[in-house]
């Protein structure tokens, strides 16, 4: 006899109950970006996942990126994107547009999606409540011919140096869901554009989050046969980088996970944001759907 839709929902809720209890009153930081952000249906599924986490007693915090949207706006305004060593150079005019797109446009779109579920989301960036302070990022690149490292001047690209959790602690005790754009001030008065992955890691570390989820366009970390690795320790992750199993763009992603764990996060997950309801599938099922990296 086939199950009705209501029977299926009841069964799934019963299976999820132990995990709801496990994460009750725990903080989960979700870095939202990639393909999921540009797909309206996936966006709605993401918003409903965040709402259900809140309704289940979890303290969810969303950090988002927006690289493609920034590039599109710069093109629209006739501003050429400049890159050094594969990284965007952010001059004064560009950082103003970055802040406008991240904190003024994308942030409010995500807030609106969550609010449509009946929950209350609030849009923030690192400037609000002096939550995050940054400084100019120090990046170097090695010249392939001379093997000499040179310092890159990326303008107003920053890295987090301080997180004050006061505002986030206040929001955790309220009904509000923080949605945070990775823009922050420096002690020098400048505004800095910060990589969303590292920004999310800094927030999660400061809060000693139970989980940090990175929604990406890939299933997670794959072994040499292309199979998903369900769980890795920090030591195992280092070994897989050393032997070439983890390569290319996955290296900085995994290194960010490791940094977050060193900062105090209990576990970091790389998962596929192109899967509908990926957040719930990761948190409220026994084996999850991504790669969990633990100390």
From Swiss-Prot:
The keyword Protease appears for this protein: no
Chain positions recorded as substrate binding sites: 66-67, 88, 193
* Superkingdom per UniProt: Bacteria
Name the InterPro entries for this protein: AceGlu_kinase-like_sf, AcgluKinase_fam, ArgB, Asp/Glu/Uridylate_kinase, Glu/AcGlu_kinase, NAGK-C
Q: Which GO terms describe its molecular function?
A: acetylglutamate kinase activity; ATP binding
What's the Enzyme Commission number for this chain? 2.7.2.8
Asked if Iron is a keyword of the record, the answer is no
Q: In which pathway does it act?
A: Amino-acid biosynthesis; L-arginine biosynthesis; N(2)-acetyl-L-ornithine from L-glutamate: step 2/4
The top EC class, named as a word, is transferase
Keyword list (alphabetical) reads: Amino-acid biosynthesis, Arginine biosynthesis, ATP-binding, Cytoplasm, Kinase, Nucleotide-binding, Transferase
Q: What GO cellular component is one of the record's annotations?
A: cytoplasm
Q: What is this protein called?
A: Acetylglutamate kinase
């Amino acid at each position: 006899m086939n199950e009705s839709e209501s029977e299926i929902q009841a069964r799934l809720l019963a299976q999820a109950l132990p995990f709801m209890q496990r994460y009750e009153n725990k903080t989960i930081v979700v870095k939202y970006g990639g393909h999921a952000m540009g797909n309206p249906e996936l966006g709605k599924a993401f918003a409903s996942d965040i709402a259900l986490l809140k309704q289940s007693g979890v303290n969810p915090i969303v950090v988002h990126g927006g690289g493609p949207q920034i590039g599109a706006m710069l093109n629209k305004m006739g501003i050429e994107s400049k890159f050094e060593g594969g990284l965007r150079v952010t001059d004064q005019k560009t950082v103003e547009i970055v802040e406008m797109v991240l904190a003024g446009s994308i942030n409010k779109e995500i807030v609106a999606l969550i609010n449509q579920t009946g929950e209350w989301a609030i849009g923030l960036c690192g400037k609000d409540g002096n939550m995050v302070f940054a400084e100019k990022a120090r990046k170097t690149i090695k010249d392939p011919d001379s093997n000499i490292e040179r310092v890159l001047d990326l303008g107003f690209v920053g890295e987090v140096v301080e997180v004050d959790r006061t505002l986030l602690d206040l929001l955790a005790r309220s009904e509000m869901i923080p949605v945070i754009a990775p823009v922050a001030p420096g002690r020098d008065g400048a505004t800095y554009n910060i990589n969303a992955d590292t920004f999310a890691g800094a927030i999660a570390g400061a809060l000693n989050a139970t989980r940090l989820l990175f929604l990406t366009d890939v299933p997670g970390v794959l072994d040499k046969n292309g199979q998903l690795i369900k769980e890795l320790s920090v030591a195992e992750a280092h070994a897989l980088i050393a032997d070439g199993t983890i390569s290319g763009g996955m290296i900085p992603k995994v290194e960010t996970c490791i940094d977050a764990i060193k900062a105090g996060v209990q576990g970091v997950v790389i998962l596929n944001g192109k899967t509908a309801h990926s957040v719930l599938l990761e948190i409220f099922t026994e084996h999850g759907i991504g790669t969990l990296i633990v100390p």
